[in-house]
Regions:
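Structured soluble/peripheral alpha/beta segments that form catalytic or ligand/cofactor-binding pockets
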Residues: 1-387
Length: 387
Protein backbone atom coordinates (compact mmCIF):
# COMPACT_ATOMS: atom_id res chain seq x y z
CA UNK A 1 0.00 0.00 0.00
CA UNK A 2 1.36 3.43 -0.91
CA UNK A 3 -1.11 5.42 1.26
CA UNK A 4 1.03 4.99 4.34
CA UNK A 5 1.99 8.02 6.41
CA UNK A 6 5.58 8.10 7.66
CA UNK A 7 6.74 11.43 9.05
CA UNK A 8 10.22 10.02 9.69
CA UNK A 9 10.76 10.45 5.94
CA UNK A 10 9.96 14.14 6.38
CA UNK A 11 12.85 14.50 8.82
CA UNK A 12 15.94 16.39 7.66
CA UNK A 13 18.26 13.95 5.90
CA UNK A 14 21.44 16.04 5.74
CA UNK A 15 23.74 13.87 7.82
CA UNK A 16 27.06 12.22 7.05
CA UNK A 17 28.25 12.85 3.47
CA UNK A 18 24.99 14.64 2.60
CA UNK A 19 25.85 17.34 5.15
CA UNK A 20 28.81 18.24 2.92
CA UNK A 21 27.13 17.74 -0.44
CA UNK A 22 23.39 17.36 -0.14
CA UNK A 23 20.06 19.15 -0.30
CA UNK A 24 16.70 18.63 1.34
CA UNK A 25 13.47 20.48 0.64
CA UNK A 26 9.88 20.60 1.79
CA UNK A 27 7.50 21.67 -1.00
CA UNK A 28 3.94 22.95 -0.59
CA UNK A 29 1.50 24.05 -3.30
CA UNK A 30 -2.16 25.03 -3.12
CA UNK A 31 -4.87 27.25 -4.58
CA UNK A 32 -6.23 30.35 -2.83
CA UNK A 33 -9.11 32.69 -3.62
CA UNK A 34 -8.85 36.45 -4.05
CA UNK A 35 -10.52 38.02 -1.01
CA UNK A 36 -12.32 40.57 -3.22
CA UNK A 37 -13.09 38.79 -6.50
CA UNK A 38 -13.08 35.15 -5.38
CA UNK A 39 -10.84 34.24 -8.31
CA UNK A 40 -8.60 31.19 -7.93
CA UNK A 41 -4.85 31.75 -7.70
CA UNK A 42 -2.24 29.02 -7.15
CA UNK A 43 0.78 29.49 -4.89
CA UNK A 44 3.82 27.52 -3.76
CA UNK A 45 6.08 27.67 -0.71
CA UNK A 46 9.29 25.70 -0.31
CA UNK A 47 11.96 25.44 2.36
CA UNK A 48 15.23 24.34 0.70
CA UNK A 49 18.39 23.58 2.69
CA UNK A 50 21.84 22.50 1.52
CA UNK A 51 25.32 21.65 2.80
CA UNK A 52 25.02 22.51 6.52
CA UNK A 53 28.58 21.27 7.19
CA UNK A 54 29.92 24.05 4.94
CA UNK A 55 28.15 26.87 6.79
CA UNK A 56 29.70 30.32 7.06
CA UNK A 57 28.63 33.50 8.81
CA UNK A 58 26.57 34.53 5.77
CA UNK A 59 24.64 32.41 3.25
CA UNK A 60 27.06 30.90 0.73
CA UNK A 61 25.50 31.40 -2.72
CA UNK A 62 26.82 29.04 -5.36
CA UNK A 63 26.16 31.33 -8.31
CA UNK A 64 28.15 34.24 -6.89
CA UNK A 65 31.27 34.58 -9.09
CA UNK A 66 33.56 35.10 -6.08
CA UNK A 67 32.35 31.85 -4.51
CA UNK A 68 32.73 30.00 -7.79
CA UNK A 69 36.28 31.29 -8.15
CA UNK A 70 37.06 30.14 -4.60
CA UNK A 71 35.50 26.73 -5.21
CA UNK A 72 32.87 27.21 -2.53
CA UNK A 73 29.72 25.11 -2.55
CA UNK A 74 26.37 26.63 -1.56
CA UNK A 75 25.26 26.48 2.06
CA UNK A 76 22.02 28.03 3.33
CA UNK A 77 18.31 27.84 3.97
CA UNK A 78 16.40 29.24 1.01
CA UNK A 79 12.74 30.10 1.53
CA UNK A 80 11.19 30.00 -1.94
CA UNK A 81 7.68 31.35 -2.46
CA UNK A 82 5.67 32.45 -5.44
CA UNK A 83 2.73 32.05 -7.74
CA UNK A 84 1.73 30.82 -11.17
CA UNK A 85 -0.33 32.63 -13.78
CA UNK A 86 0.39 35.58 -16.05
CA UNK A 87 2.14 37.26 -13.10
CA UNK A 88 4.11 34.11 -12.24
CA UNK A 89 7.17 34.72 -10.10
CA UNK A 90 9.56 33.02 -7.70
CA UNK A 91 10.93 34.87 -4.69
CA UNK A 92 13.96 33.70 -2.70
CA UNK A 93 15.06 34.60 0.81
CA UNK A 94 18.37 33.21 2.06
CA UNK A 95 19.50 32.51 5.63
CA UNK A 96 22.88 31.48 7.01
CA UNK A 97 22.79 28.26 9.00
CA UNK A 98 23.62 30.12 12.23
CA UNK A 99 20.26 31.86 11.92
CA UNK A 100 18.29 28.64 11.35
CA UNK A 101 16.61 26.67 14.12
CA UNK A 102 16.14 23.11 12.90
CA UNK A 103 14.49 20.20 14.66
CA UNK A 104 15.68 17.63 12.19
CA UNK A 105 14.03 14.54 13.65
CA UNK A 106 10.36 13.71 13.19
CA UNK A 107 8.21 15.70 13.42
CA UNK A 108 10.46 18.16 11.60
CA UNK A 109 10.41 21.89 12.28
CA UNK A 110 12.56 24.54 10.60
CA UNK A 111 12.50 28.19 11.54
CA UNK A 112 14.41 31.36 10.65
CA UNK A 113 13.27 34.88 11.54
CA UNK A 114 9.52 34.97 10.78
CA UNK A 115 9.67 31.92 8.46
CA UNK A 116 8.53 28.53 9.77
CA UNK A 117 7.69 25.15 8.27
CA UNK A 118 6.47 22.05 10.09
CA UNK A 119 4.11 19.13 9.53
CA UNK A 120 1.13 21.29 10.46
CA UNK A 121 2.05 24.94 9.90
CA UNK A 122 3.62 27.35 7.40
CA UNK A 123 4.45 30.97 8.16
CA UNK A 124 6.73 33.52 6.58
CA UNK A 125 7.42 36.36 4.21
CA UNK A 126 9.67 37.28 1.30
CA UNK A 127 10.19 40.76 -0.14
CA UNK A 128 12.48 41.45 -3.10
CA UNK A 129 12.64 44.88 -4.74
CA UNK A 130 13.13 45.17 -8.52
CA UNK A 131 16.49 46.83 -7.93
CA UNK A 132 17.72 44.07 -5.63
CA UNK A 133 16.55 41.33 -7.99
CA UNK A 134 18.41 42.97 -10.89
CA UNK A 135 21.55 43.58 -8.85
CA UNK A 136 21.76 40.02 -7.50
CA UNK A 137 21.47 37.41 -10.26
CA UNK A 138 22.99 34.92 -7.80
CA UNK A 139 19.64 35.05 -5.95
CA UNK A 140 18.05 33.42 -9.03
CA UNK A 141 14.71 35.13 -8.39
CA UNK A 142 12.20 37.78 -9.39
CA UNK A 143 10.89 40.86 -7.61
CA UNK A 144 7.77 40.90 -5.47
CA UNK A 145 6.32 40.50 -1.99
CA UNK A 146 4.53 37.56 -0.41
CA UNK A 147 3.57 36.61 3.13
CA UNK A 148 1.57 33.68 4.47
CA UNK A 149 0.08 32.14 7.62
CA UNK A 150 -1.26 28.63 7.03
CA UNK A 151 -2.15 25.37 8.71
CA UNK A 152 -1.61 22.07 6.91
CA UNK A 153 -3.50 18.78 7.16
CA UNK A 154 -1.72 16.07 5.16
CA UNK A 155 -4.52 13.64 4.32
CA UNK A 156 -3.35 11.12 1.71
CA UNK A 157 0.26 9.98 1.42
CA UNK A 158 2.38 8.57 -1.39
CA UNK A 159 4.97 6.43 0.32
CA UNK A 160 7.33 5.10 -2.36
CA UNK A 161 8.25 2.14 -0.18
CA UNK A 162 11.61 0.41 0.04
CA UNK A 163 13.32 2.84 -2.33
CA UNK A 164 13.33 5.53 0.36
CA UNK A 165 13.53 3.19 3.36
CA UNK A 166 16.07 3.71 6.14
CA UNK A 167 18.56 1.08 4.87
CA UNK A 168 18.71 2.69 1.43
CA UNK A 169 18.76 6.18 2.95
CA UNK A 170 21.65 5.23 5.22
CA UNK A 171 23.50 3.72 2.27
CA UNK A 172 22.77 6.84 0.17
CA UNK A 173 21.91 4.44 -2.61
CA UNK A 174 19.98 6.94 -4.71
CA UNK A 175 21.10 10.36 -5.90
CA UNK A 176 17.58 11.76 -5.29
CA UNK A 177 14.84 10.56 -2.95
CA UNK A 178 11.12 11.39 -2.81
CA UNK A 179 8.37 11.19 -0.22
CA UNK A 180 4.89 12.74 -0.49
CA UNK A 181 3.47 12.79 3.03
CA UNK A 182 0.55 14.87 1.76
CA UNK A 183 -0.09 14.35 -1.94
CA UNK A 184 -3.60 15.42 -0.92
CA UNK A 185 -3.36 18.13 1.72
CA UNK A 186 -5.87 20.59 3.17
CA UNK A 187 -4.52 24.10 3.75
CA UNK A 188 -6.24 26.87 5.68
CA UNK A 189 -5.23 30.48 6.26
CA UNK A 190 -4.22 33.60 4.38
CA UNK A 191 -1.71 34.74 1.76
CA UNK A 192 -0.80 38.29 0.79
CA UNK A 193 0.83 38.68 -2.62
CA UNK A 194 1.92 42.08 -3.94
CA UNK A 195 -0.61 43.81 -1.71
CA UNK A 196 -3.62 41.63 -2.51
CA UNK A 197 -5.24 39.40 0.08
CA UNK A 198 -6.06 35.75 -0.59
CA UNK A 199 -7.98 33.22 1.49
CA UNK A 200 -7.06 29.53 1.62
CA UNK A 201 -9.76 27.01 2.57
CA UNK A 202 -9.59 23.20 2.85
CA UNK A 203 -12.38 22.57 0.33
CA UNK A 204 -10.91 24.71 -2.45
CA UNK A 205 -7.16 24.58 -1.92
CA UNK A 206 -6.43 21.31 -3.80
CA UNK A 207 -3.27 21.17 -1.75
CA UNK A 208 -0.09 19.14 -2.12
CA UNK A 209 2.99 18.59 0.08
CA UNK A 210 6.09 16.50 -0.53
CA UNK A 211 9.84 16.50 -0.10
CA UNK A 212 12.96 15.56 -2.03
CA UNK A 213 16.51 15.13 -0.86
CA UNK A 214 19.83 13.79 -2.10
CA UNK A 215 23.18 14.70 -3.58
CA UNK A 216 22.00 15.58 -7.10
CA UNK A 217 18.86 16.19 -9.16
CA UNK A 218 17.36 14.00 -11.86
CA UNK A 219 17.20 14.53 -15.60
CA UNK A 220 14.68 14.42 -17.06
CA UNK A 221 12.68 15.79 -14.16
CA UNK A 222 8.96 14.94 -14.22
CA UNK A 223 6.14 15.78 -11.80
CA UNK A 224 2.35 15.73 -12.27
CA UNK A 225 -0.28 15.77 -9.52
CA UNK A 226 -3.84 16.87 -8.79
CA UNK A 227 -6.71 16.21 -6.42
CA UNK A 228 -9.20 18.46 -8.24
CA UNK A 229 -10.81 15.58 -10.11
CA UNK A 230 -14.20 14.89 -11.71
CA UNK A 231 -15.43 11.52 -12.94
CA UNK A 232 -16.74 11.54 -16.50
CA UNK A 233 -18.68 8.39 -15.65
CA UNK A 234 -20.69 9.85 -12.77
CA UNK A 235 -20.13 13.61 -13.37
CA UNK A 236 -19.32 13.83 -9.67
CA UNK A 237 -16.27 15.40 -8.11
CA UNK A 238 -13.92 12.79 -6.65
CA UNK A 239 -13.33 14.18 -3.17
CA UNK A 240 -11.29 11.25 -1.87
CA UNK A 241 -8.93 10.91 -4.82
CA UNK A 242 -5.53 12.11 -6.00
CA UNK A 243 -2.89 11.13 -8.53
CA UNK A 244 0.83 11.72 -8.36
CA UNK A 245 3.52 10.97 -10.97
CA UNK A 246 7.20 11.75 -10.59
CA UNK A 247 10.73 10.74 -11.40
CA UNK A 248 12.88 10.77 -14.48
CA UNK A 249 16.17 8.91 -14.60
CA UNK A 250 17.09 7.73 -11.10
CA UNK A 251 20.67 6.91 -10.19
CA UNK A 252 21.41 4.07 -7.80
CA UNK A 253 24.99 3.88 -6.54
CA UNK A 254 25.87 6.44 -9.25
CA UNK A 255 24.56 4.16 -12.01
CA UNK A 256 21.68 5.72 -13.99
CA UNK A 257 18.65 3.56 -14.66
CA UNK A 258 16.55 3.85 -17.79
CA UNK A 259 14.15 6.77 -17.57
CA UNK A 260 11.54 5.70 -15.04
CA UNK A 261 8.53 7.18 -13.31
CA UNK A 262 6.70 6.43 -10.10
CA UNK A 263 2.96 6.84 -10.51
CA UNK A 264 -0.08 6.28 -8.30
CA UNK A 265 -3.79 7.04 -8.31
CA UNK A 266 -5.79 6.95 -5.09
CA UNK A 267 -9.26 6.53 -6.58
CA UNK A 268 -11.97 6.97 -3.93
CA UNK A 269 -10.08 4.71 -1.54
CA UNK A 270 -8.79 2.24 -4.11
CA UNK A 271 -5.07 2.20 -4.88
CA UNK A 272 -3.63 2.00 -8.39
CA UNK A 273 0.12 1.58 -8.01
CA UNK A 274 2.65 1.95 -10.83
CA UNK A 275 5.86 1.98 -8.81
CA UNK A 276 8.68 0.53 -10.93
CA UNK A 277 10.62 -0.48 -7.80
CA UNK A 278 7.89 -3.01 -6.91
CA UNK A 279 9.17 -5.69 -9.25
CA UNK A 280 6.22 -8.04 -8.72
CA UNK A 281 3.93 -5.47 -10.41
CA UNK A 282 5.96 -5.64 -13.65
CA UNK A 283 5.40 -1.95 -14.33
CA UNK A 284 5.90 -0.59 -17.84
CA UNK A 285 5.95 3.13 -18.55
CA UNK A 286 6.08 5.35 -21.60
CA UNK A 287 6.13 9.12 -21.33
CA UNK A 288 6.66 12.11 -23.55
CA UNK A 289 6.90 15.87 -23.21
CA UNK A 290 6.21 18.25 -26.07
CA UNK A 291 6.87 21.97 -26.06
CA UNK A 292 4.83 24.11 -28.45
CA UNK A 293 4.69 27.86 -28.99
CA UNK A 294 2.03 28.49 -26.37
CA UNK A 295 1.73 25.32 -24.29
CA UNK A 296 3.52 22.24 -23.06
CA UNK A 297 2.01 18.74 -23.02
CA UNK A 298 2.80 15.59 -21.05
CA UNK A 299 1.69 12.09 -22.08
CA UNK A 300 2.23 9.23 -19.63
CA UNK A 301 1.09 5.63 -19.94
CA UNK A 302 1.73 3.24 -17.06
CA UNK A 303 0.74 -0.40 -16.87
CA UNK A 304 1.10 -3.21 -14.34
CA UNK A 305 -0.23 -6.74 -14.04
CA UNK A 306 -3.54 -5.47 -12.63
CA UNK A 307 -4.32 -2.13 -14.27
CA UNK A 308 -3.24 0.75 -16.50
CA UNK A 309 -3.31 4.54 -16.31
CA UNK A 310 -3.09 7.01 -19.20
CA UNK A 311 -2.43 10.64 -18.30
CA UNK A 312 -2.43 13.69 -20.56
CA UNK A 313 -1.68 17.12 -19.11
CA UNK A 314 -1.56 20.56 -20.74
CA UNK A 315 -0.31 23.85 -19.32
CA UNK A 316 0.03 27.29 -20.92
CA UNK A 317 3.60 28.57 -20.96
CA UNK A 318 2.45 32.09 -20.05
CA UNK A 319 1.21 30.69 -16.71
CA UNK A 320 4.43 28.83 -15.89
CA UNK A 321 7.87 29.46 -14.46
CA UNK A 322 11.31 28.32 -15.43
CA UNK A 323 12.02 27.45 -11.83
CA UNK A 324 15.53 27.93 -10.47
CA UNK A 325 17.71 25.71 -8.30
CA UNK A 326 21.42 25.19 -7.86
CA UNK A 327 22.77 21.74 -7.03
CA UNK A 328 24.73 21.18 -3.81
CA UNK A 329 27.97 20.98 -5.80
CA UNK A 330 27.32 24.56 -6.96
CA UNK A 331 26.41 23.71 -10.55
CA UNK A 332 23.26 24.95 -12.23
CA UNK A 333 22.44 22.51 -15.00
CA UNK A 334 18.62 22.77 -14.92
CA UNK A 335 18.08 26.03 -16.80
CA UNK A 336 14.83 25.11 -18.52
CA UNK A 337 12.80 23.46 -15.79
CA UNK A 338 9.16 24.19 -16.62
CA UNK A 339 7.01 24.43 -13.49
CA UNK A 340 3.29 25.18 -13.26
CA UNK A 341 0.21 24.93 -11.09
CA UNK A 342 -2.54 25.64 -13.64
CA UNK A 343 -2.39 22.41 -15.61
CA UNK A 344 -5.44 20.58 -16.90
CA UNK A 345 -6.03 17.24 -18.57
CA UNK A 346 -7.46 13.75 -18.29
CA UNK A 347 -6.58 10.47 -16.63
CA UNK A 348 -7.97 7.16 -17.88
CA UNK A 349 -7.98 4.27 -15.42
CA UNK A 350 -8.23 0.68 -16.63
CA UNK A 351 -8.64 -2.62 -14.79
CA UNK A 352 -7.36 -5.87 -16.23
CA UNK A 353 -10.07 -8.52 -16.57
CA UNK A 354 -9.45 -11.88 -18.21
CA UNK A 355 -6.29 -10.52 -19.77
CA UNK A 356 -7.99 -7.44 -21.25
CA UNK A 357 -7.89 -3.83 -20.08
CA UNK A 358 -11.38 -2.46 -19.35
CA UNK A 359 -11.91 1.29 -18.89
CA UNK A 360 -12.94 1.94 -15.28
CA UNK A 361 -13.24 5.72 -15.47
CA UNK A 362 -12.03 8.76 -17.34
CA UNK A 363 -11.26 11.60 -14.99
CA UNK A 364 -11.05 15.30 -15.75
CA UNK A 365 -8.30 17.03 -13.79
CA UNK A 366 -7.60 20.71 -13.18
CA UNK A 367 -5.31 22.66 -10.84
CA UNK A 368 -2.56 20.21 -11.84
CA UNK A 369 0.91 20.75 -10.49
CA UNK A 370 3.27 20.02 -13.36
CA UNK A 371 6.98 20.05 -14.04
CA UNK A 372 9.45 19.00 -16.70
CA UNK A 373 13.10 19.75 -17.39
CA UNK A 374 16.36 18.29 -18.65
CA UNK A 375 19.98 19.21 -18.07
CA UNK A 376 21.32 21.60 -20.68
CA UNK A 377 23.62 19.07 -22.35
CA UNK A 378 20.96 16.39 -22.87
CA UNK A 379 19.52 15.63 -26.27
CA UNK A 380 15.97 16.92 -26.91
CA UNK A 381 13.52 14.49 -25.36
CA UNK A 382 10.68 12.95 -27.31
CA UNK A 383 9.58 9.54 -26.07
CA UNK A 384 11.21 6.78 -24.08
CA UNK A 385 9.81 3.45 -22.98
CA UNK A 386 10.97 2.23 -19.56
CA UNK A 387 10.53 -1.43 -18.70
Amino acid sequence: MFHHHDITRDACMLRGPLAHQGYDWWWHSFTAQDAVTGEDKPFFIEFFVCNPALAEAEPVLGQLPANQAAGKKPSYLMVKAGTWGEDACQLHRFFAWKDVHLHGDAPYRIEASDCLASETALKGSVSISPGKAAAHPEWMCDAGEMSWDLTVDKQIAFNVGYGASKPLRDAEAFAMYWHAEGMKSAYSGTVTFNGRQYTVTPDRCYGYADKNWGRDFTTPWVWLSSNCLTSKKTRQQLRNSVFDIGGGRPKIYFVPLDRRLLGVFYYEGREYDFNFSKLHLMVKTTFSFDEHDEEVIWHVRQENIHAAMETEVHCLKKDMLLINYEAPDGSRRHNRLWNGGNGWGTVKLYDRQDGRLILTDEIEATHIGCEYGEYDHDEPYHEVTAK
